Design a protein with these regions (language model features):
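Short acidic, Pro/Gly- and aromatic-enriched capping/linker segments at domain boundaries
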Residues: 1-4
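Long, non-globular targeting/processing and low-complexity regions
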Residues: 6, 13-189
Length: 189
């Protein structure tokens, strides 16, 4: 068994992902459960309220397919926000908005080819704020809806917990095996 993981820690939370290459393979079960989303006009929206959709404030392992798919969807939406706002970190090895298209296409391909359903990012998980200051005047900024989040330093915008996107096989293994999971924690109490 080969384990791959990423670890993040800050003053309030810690999280990491574990990707196993063997274990209880749920591919057939997932394909059957998500078969209503197999038609070209049907898409399963992520993140959604099926499964865990808030990560980083509780000590727990999230190993359900829906929870892992939500985690991935939230990570991708953080990158999408960076893309549409034109934020880049050229000085960093971290993922940026420039990576969004490639990673989103990878998720759609794995869901369609391996699990036989269509997936789409849930645009309603993003909200826009209008702010004002004396120098800029009115300006807008985007963030995730409060219902869906990954604690700040465990998110893709901080370059964390993205190893599932190393390859299509890694993404498939992360999603299909019950022994692959997201572990979250909190040291606030």
């Amino acid at each position: 068994m080969k384990l791959r993981s990423d670890y993040v820690s800050n003053s309030s939370s810690s999280s990491f992902i574990v990707i196993n290459k063997e274990g209880i393979d749920r591919t057939e079960e997932i394909s059957e459960e998500f078969s209503p989303y197999n038609e070209p006009w049907q898409h399963y929206l992520v993140p959604c309220k099926n499964g865990k959709h808030q990560f980083g404030w509780e000590w727990e392992d999230s190993c359900s397919f829906e929870s892992k798919l939500n985690f991935i969807g939230i990570q991708l939406l953080y990158l999408f926000i960076e893309k549409i706002e034109g934020r880049d970190r050229e000085y960093s090895r971290m993922y940026t908005g420039k990576d969004f298209d490639r990673l989103y296409d990878m998720l759609k391909k794995v869901c369609k080819e391996k699990f036989h359903f269509n997936v789409e990012l849930n645009e309603d998980a993003i909200k826009t704020h209008i702010s004002h200051d004396d120098k800029k005047g009115y300006y807008g900024w985007r963030c995730m809806n409060d219902e869906f989040y990954i604690d700040h330093q465990s998110a893709s915008s901080e370059g964390s917990c993205m190893e599932m996107f190393e390859s299509e096989d890694a993404l498939y293994d992360f999603l299909r095996f019950e022994e692959s999971y997201v572990r979250g924690g909190n040291d606030n109490g």
